[in-house]
Amino acid sequence: NITLTQEEIDLLAKIVWLESQGEPTEGQEAVVEVVFNRMASEKYPDTLYDVLSQGNPTQFCSWKNRERANPTEKEYTSIHEVLNGNTHILRNDTLYFSTEPLTPRLDQKIGGHSFCY
């Protein structure tokens, strides 16, 4: 179970907007799930900030541009849908997404992203 402060939700909304603007809602929700899967994984830090800002190479290369983000209600809705358990799209061990599969273990392709475990 993941609980976020409003400040963390605002930060996540910026990253979701930067990483997946123009993607379908399901694609944005899947990006949120990757963040939460990483927080739950022993392979990654357990805080939102640490997952999003993790060093090079970083999954979230948009981190450096976060202050320029302009998230909309769509990003906030996607976050709350995942936080509240209303949607569950990916496997719990899906930890990566990219425009091309990063590993041969493809979970799903949603919009322009491949989600891998």
Where are these regions (language model features)?
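Bacterial extracytoplasmic/cell-wall-associated proteins, especially those involved in peptidoglycan
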Residues: N1-Y117
